[in-house]
């Protein structure tokens, strides 16, 4: 009877749109440099934001000024963002030795929930880490280990009796890090409820076999949401059945004043921004759709060659793919033994394409 008139306030978690906005703004200078946002809110980020290119001449997440204005307006017009407090920003490690392209990990508090978010691939350090993730002898990588250490530290520091739920999220490599944490800590931490990964790549066979029990226990808590034309979520093997695709829209960004055009066009297709639709200058996540045929073909092909290539060929292949997006000091981030193709690699590679084409109906050599 004491509780007859008592109604517990049920607070809804952040929406998918709000999580995607957070993952988008992690690419901005305000999160990448310094600690000035710690103790402030996401709405404060909007007030302090200044549009600028990074040291390599990139837009933040390949989002141009016109597009970023819509991100700002979205944050301004939703009062939820003024209630999301930024507890911690870790940007102390960089993707290049000169300090550019920081690796960013952020902890946020909203009502009685903690959100731990991870930015996507940063510089040569993490592109090399992506290639190493494909090695059959790799169980987990240095970047995944560091993400787990950050999560553990934040969990210990901020998850007390007042916190009811914890969520992990990230875009691209950050999405993979958040999935990794859900697998490793999902059974141990009952408050860790969900992982929301955006365009996160998969895992190698060794990891999936070693952690098969943990994956089975936690895969229903992992959501991987990707753009229909995204080329990162197709890499390696996905560990969740909760894979959603949303319609992507991109104008490839503005190319004016750009130095790294190839990186920019690649980046524009993979940017978190492509998953938004706009109405009256305010952004929401776009409609659900199917994965594009081209990306489905790429996914099948990557799985085929990983299964059929020699170990040395596959290691070279993944380092070669990663190196496209390493913009400087390449020799530091590509092991010496994988800077040149193994003898006969291209002949074998063309044979793989031919054999894959025979196995898959309605796929042309040109598509591959």
Q: Which residues are covered by each model-predicted region?
A:
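Alpha/beta hydrolase fold serine-hydrolase catalytic domain that processes acyl esters and thioesters
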Residues: 3-14, 22, 26-34, 40-76, ...
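Active-site-adjacent helix-turn-beta-strand microarchitecture at beta-sheet edges
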Residues: 87
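Gly/Ala-rich beta-loop-alpha elbow adjacent to hydrolase catalytic centers
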Residues: 169-174, 178
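Short glycine-enriched nucleophile-adjacent loop
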Residues: 178-187
């Amino acid at each position: 009877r004491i509780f007859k008139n008592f109604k517990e306030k049920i607070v809804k978690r952040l929406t998918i749109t709000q999580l995607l906005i957070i993952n988008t703004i992690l690419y901005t200078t305000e999160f990448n440099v310094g600690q000035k946002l710690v103790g402030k809110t996401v709405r404060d980020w909007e007030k302090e934001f200044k549009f600028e290119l990074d040291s390599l001449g990139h837009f933040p997440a390949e989002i141009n000024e016109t597009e970023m204005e819509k991100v700002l307006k979205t944050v301004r017009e939703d009062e939820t963002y003024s209630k999301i407090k930024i507890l911690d920003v870790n940007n102390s490690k960089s993707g290049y030795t000169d300090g550019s392209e920081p690796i960013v990990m952020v902890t946020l508090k909203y009502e009685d929930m903690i959100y731990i978010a991870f930015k996507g691939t940063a510089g040569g350090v993490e592109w090399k880490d992506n290639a190493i993730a494909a090695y059959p002898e790799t169980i987990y990588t240095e970047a995944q280990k560091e993400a787990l250490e950050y999560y553990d530290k934040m969990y210990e520091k901020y998850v007390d009796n007042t916190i009811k739920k914890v969520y992990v999220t990230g875009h691209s490599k950050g999405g993979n890090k958040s999935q990794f944490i859900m697998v490793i800590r999902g059974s141990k931490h009952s408050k860790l409820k969900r992982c929301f990964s955006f365009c996160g790549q998969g895992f190698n066979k060794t990891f999936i076999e070693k952690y098969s029990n943990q994956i089975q226990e936690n895969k229903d808590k992992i959501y991987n949401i990707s753009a229909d034309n995204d080329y990162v979520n197709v890499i390696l093997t996905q560990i969740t059945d909760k894979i959603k695709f949303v319609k992507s829209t991109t104008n490839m960004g503005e190319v004016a004043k750009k130095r790294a055009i190839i990186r920019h066009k690649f980046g524009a297709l993979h940017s978190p921004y492509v998953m938004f639709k706009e109405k009256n200058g305010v952004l929401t996540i776009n409609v659900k759709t199917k994965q594009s045929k081209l990306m489905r073909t790429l996914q099948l092909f990557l799985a085929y060659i990983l299964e059929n290539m020699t170990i040395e060929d596959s290691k070279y292949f993944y380092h070669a793919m990663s190196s496209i997006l390493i913009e400087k000091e390449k020799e530091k981030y590509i092991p010496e033994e994988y800077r040149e193709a193994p003898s006969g690699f291209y002949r074998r590679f063309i044979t793989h394409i031919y054999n894959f084409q025979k196995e898959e109906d309605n796929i042309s050599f040109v598509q591959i």
